[in-house]
Amino acid sequence: VQHTDRNSYYGAQQNPDAYGKTKDLTWVVGGMYVGNFEKVLFSPATFTAGMEYQNNSLHDIMLGYHRDMKQDVRIAGGFVQNEWKMNRFILLAGFRVDSHNLIDNPIFSPRVNLLYKPTDKFQARLTWSTGFRAPQAYDEDLHVTAVGGEGVLIKLADGLKPEHSNSFSGSVDWTANIGHWQTNLLLEAFYTGLDDVFVLEKIGQDEQGNTVKERRNGNGARVYGVNLDGKLAHGRDVALQVGFTVQRSRYTKYENWSEDENVEPTKFMPRTPDYYGYFTLTSAPFKNFDMSVSGVYTGRMHVPHLAPDFSVIPENYEYSYIRKDELVHTPDFFDLNLKLNYTFVLNDHIKLQLNGGVQNLFNAFQKDLDKGGFRDSGYFYGPTQPRTYFIGVKITN
């Protein structure tokens, strides 16, 4: 059970009527059965079945924007799957059925997974799975972005259909010991096709002059790429984990993202970089001392930057803004973090740990944030905080 009672303010130009209140209650109940059988068809197997019921009641009020939205979502679902265990193969097949009160027909979602493991140090996997996203209001739809001193509201289109996904992936996983070092390498390729993908399109203004965007079904999208993960460890002394992904996220046809007819549509899915990766290095060279260094690389991406309505901006305003909507190709970022820990043993039962470090050491942060009361508050990308120093104390028993 989860309950949210949130007071909010989504206003611009110190709008006194932009306060709101959201109440959201979600509860889930379900059960599962697992049975092991000596033989099902051709090999020993594990059978799993389960049922689940979800209920979500949402009431969002923002009187200043004339919004009073009530949404009740009820989902009844069930799944069955069987896992066959053979000498070198493990085959898993199953499906899930969901009945959603906002969708006319039940959603059938099958999946298949085949694992090949000839030795303890090597395995290969093939997976096919399906899924959906229901045509309902999500948490991001409740937030009101401010552009040009006015609010931007999101509404659902009439007849909005569910978004469906069809995913394929294949991977190989290799593990080896080289002297006193333990190594692991994972190479994965993936492809996901999205049909009736959700897109946002600007449709005009409401009676209060706020911009209204409508969540509609687009033509479709494709997300595909390769991922490489590696691990290297030498006991407690040092451990390194790295990963890098090359990905393409594209709409199947050009989609409009701005109502300005002079702005070109795009096939790029917004805020999805083509390259991203990470690394984590931990070391404990001494008995009471350990450290960690980690980094996240975020490649360039396309982010919409919306221009304000200049007819409402006073002359000689202290901030300047772009003249028309732009699809910005952002720079890439490398966010490096460092943390040091030292533990003092006070007695047999109590330990005192002092820690300190820095987050975003290189201060990789967006340089072109809009400013002032007419800014595009949704124009934000990259690391969420600039260079930050921290210290901490932890007592354990």
What are these regions (language model features)?
Residues 195, 297-315, 342-397:
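C-terminal beta-signal and adjacent terminal beta-strands/loops
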Residues 85, 90, 184-185, 189-193, ...:
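Gram-negative outer-membrane beta-barrel transporters
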Residues 1-104, 182-191, 225-227, 239-245:
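Face-selective signature of the C-terminal outer-membrane beta-barrel domain
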Residues 1-5, 53-59, 86-88, 95-101, ...:
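Transmembrane beta-strands of outer-membrane beta-barrel pores
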Residues 39-47, 88-91, 121-124, 178-183, ...:
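Repeated loop/turn-to-beta-strand initiation elements of outer-membrane beta-barrel proteins
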Residues 44-46, 67-193, 245, 282:
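Structural signature of Gram-negative outer-membrane beta-barrels, strongest in the C-terminal barrel
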Residues 1-10, 117, 125, 159-216, ...:
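Membrane-embedded beta-barrel scaffold of Gram-negative outer-membrane proteins
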Residues 23-27, 70-76, 106-108, 164-168, ...:
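Residues that define the transmembrane beta-barrel architecture of outer-membrane proteins
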